[in-house]
Amino acid sequence: MWYFAWILGTLLACSFGVITALALEHVESGKAGQEDI
């Protein structure tokens, strides 16, 4: 049953990375938008 934990951990790590990348991109775009005003 070790493979279940391995797959779960891998998916969790990948999803965390994607969410972090999207959050950073959102913050950067927000800063860029404020500079234009």
From Swiss-Prot:
It holds the Pfam family YbgT_YccB. Its EC number is 7.1.1.7. Disruption phenotype: Slow growth in aerobic liquid culture, forms mixed colonies on aerobic solid media, increased sensitivity to reductant (beta-mercapoethanol). Reduced cytochrome bd-I oxidase activity. Changing residue 7 to A: Does not restore reductant (beta-mercapoethanol) resistance. One of its GO terms (molecular function) is oxidoreductase activity, acting on diphenols and related substances as donors. The chain crosses the membrane at residues 4-24. It is a single-pass membrane protein. It comes from the Bacteria. It catalyses: 2 a ubiquinol + O2(in) + 4 H(+)(in) = 2 a ubiquinone + 2 H2O(in) + 4 H(+)(out). Keywords: Cell inner membrane, Cell membrane, Electron transport, Membrane, Stress response, Translocase, Transmembrane, Transmembrane helix, Transport. GO terms for biological process: aerobic electron transport chain; oxidative phosphorylation. It is an enzyme of class 7 (translocase). Changing residue 1 to Q: Does not restore reductant (beta-mercapoethanol) resistance. GO terms for cellular component: cytochrome complex; membrane; outer membrane; plasma membrane. Pathway: Energy metabolism; oxidative phosphorylation. It is found in: Cell inner membrane. Induction: Constitutively expressed during aerobic growth, induced in low oxygen, and maybe by SDS/EDTA (envelope stress) (at protein level). Required for correct functioning of cytochrome bd-I oxidase. This protein and AppX may have some functional overlap. NCBIfam families: cyd_oper_ybgT. Belongs to the cytochrome ubiquinol oxidase subunit X family. May be a subunit of cytochrome bd-I ubiquinol oxidase. Probably interacts with CydA and CydB. This is Cytochrome bd-I ubiquinol oxidase subunit X. The gene is cydX.
